[in-house]
Curated annotation (Swiss-Prot):
Family statement drawn from the similarity comment of this UniProt entry: Belongs to the lyase 1 family. Argininosuccinate lyase subfamily.
Subcellular location: Cytoplasm
Principal subcellular localisation of the protein: cytoplasm
Protein name: Argininosuccinate lyase
NCBIfam families per the UniProt record, alphabetical: argH
Enzyme class: lyase
């Protein structure tokens, strides 16, 4: 660190800061990712200072020009932050001083690094929320396409990882659509709390200068300004909320990934993953592995860990600002990039999967998953459900014992369990008839899936 590069807080101290302590406390290797947001916030701040006659218009022009040049230098890599600079704010201010001299010191009038970094973080979050919403929207469009393609393909629905009832594959894909819709809603709701400017709170108690926080909020396209200067700089709940929303989103992706991994296995054989999204084995030449799905499933743990990390960092901190909060950047940045990249690659993966329709047709036509239809058939004949359930259980036991599937049980055999059976039972034991017999709202029938598709398309139009 050259003699010209003084730490921003160093003037009060008679001894230089220990180099090992500086290296330990330096965050520039992480927070350099905020250089655009930092410069954007600084330009808004000095513009407001000039409008409030705290600095001159000429000084403002010099500051803005210098900041724009530094932004280009950082973007191009001609200005490389060093750990001795402590943080990205110091990098920018020191470089500004080299460019325009002592006027650079006026950039911090009425501002602390506390409200500065809080502003940077909110600007960053706003951008990442927009990117993530776009990624989720692309996933939803993909799911609508899959649901349209496979709306009349019958697959097994599962509970406890056991075949439960036949359903439309379109119904399955639209279930994920609904989950990701709530994920988008969480982000949209969070944005209301993120898009509030903390700039003007200073260190935590405000400033004696005639600042205009509403003006900087306007310049930075914030919807509102802080109401309490302590709160503005001392909480990180919006970061925790963002990581929490991402954790839920990654949980959805992880569950979806698990289905793809299982369904693409030889044991299930329901689905084929394109070679472009599968890998092999360095030893076993026959292998085709669902590695992308497995990686998304694994990365979910990273995001969960980031959530616990943030909650632990903030646990028990006294008001207002504490240096512990410097540790918020790594979990935030990692969560944003991991979730966005996972959503994007998983959307592409879904586009490179194909259901094995003929195999599914063969499997669903000869399976015990039609047992519920027998119970509901008896209920439609005015038998109490509990009795219908008991009788159907006996029929299933008989089917397994005789080694025959439910549709192959003769009417005479059915009637040994209940005289209510007639030839109409066989209509219920066809997978397509089973699916289309569902009359309740949001069910798996082809008609219901078509209505759900129309609703999904309408929602996507509204959210554009």
């Amino acid at each position: 660190m050259s003699d010209k590069k003084e730490l921003l807080w160093q003037s009060r101290f008679s001894e230089p800061f220990d180099r090992d302590a500086l290296r330990f406390s330096s965050s520039v290797h992480i927070d350099k990712a905020l250089f655009r947001e930092d410069i954007e916030g600084s330009i808004a701040h000095v513009t407001m200072l000039a409008e409030q006659d705290i600095i001159s218009d000429a000084e403002c022009a010099d500051l803005v020009q210098g900041l724009r040049e530094i932004e280009e230098e950082l973007a191009s890599g001609t200005l490389v932050p060093h750990w001795e600079d402590e943080d990205i704010h110091t990098v920018i201010e020191n470089r500004l001083k080299e460019k325009i001299g002592q006027t650079a010191g006026k950039i911090h009038s009425g501002r602390s690094r506390n409200d500065q970094v809080a502003t940077d973080t909110r600007l960053y979050l706003r951008k990442k929320i927009a990117e993530l919403q776009d990624a989720v929207q692309a996933m939803q469009q993909m799911l609508i396409g899959k649901a349209e393609t496979y709306k009349e393909t019958i697959i097994f629905g599962y509970t406890h990882l056991q075949r439960a009832q036949p359903i439309s594959a379109g119904h399955y894909y639209l279930a994920w659509f609904s989950m990701f819709r709530r994920d988008r809603e969480r982000l949209r709701d969070l944005l209301r709390r993120v898009n509030i400017s903390p700039l003007g709170a200073a260190a935590f108690a405000g400033s004696t200068l005639p600042l205009n926080p509403a003006r900087t909020a306007e310049l930075l396209a914030f919807d509102d300004i802080f109401s309490n200067s302590i709160d503005a700089v001392s909480d990180r709940d919006i970061l925790i909320e963002f990581i929490s929303a991402c954790s839920i989103m990654m949980m959805h992706l992880s569950r979806f990934a698990e289905d793809l991994i299982l369904w693409s296995s030889y044991e299930f054989g329901y689905l084929e993953i394109s070679d472009a999204f599968a890998t092999g084995s360095s030893l076993m030449p026959q292998k085709k592995n669902a590695d992308i799905a497995e990686l998304v499933r694994g990365k979910t743990g990273r995001v969960y860990g980031n959530l616990v990390s943030m909650l632990t960092i903030m646990k028990g901190l006294p008001l207002s600002y504490n240096r512990d909060m410097q540790e918020d950047k790594q979990p935030l940045f990692d969560t944003a990039e991991t979730t966005i990249s996972s959503m994007r690659i998983f959307t592409k993966l879904i586009g490179h999967t194909t259901l094995k329709v003929e195999r599914l047709r063969s499997l669903t036509s000869e399976d015990l998953s039609l047992a519920t239809e027998i119970a509901e058939y008896l209920v439609s004949r005015n038998l109490p459900f509990r009795e219908a359930h008991r009788i159907t259980g006996k029929i299933v036991t008989f089917s397994i014992g005789e080694g025959i599937t439910l549709p192959r049980i003769t009417l005479e055999q059915f009637r040994t369990f209940s005289p209510l059976f007639d030839s109409a039972i066989y209509d219920s034991l066809k997978p397509e008839a089973s699916v289309n017999s569902k009359k309740s709202h949001g069910s798996c029938s082809f008609r219901s899936v078509e209505a759900q598709l129309a609703e999904a398309r309408a929602q996507m139009q509204e959210n554009r």
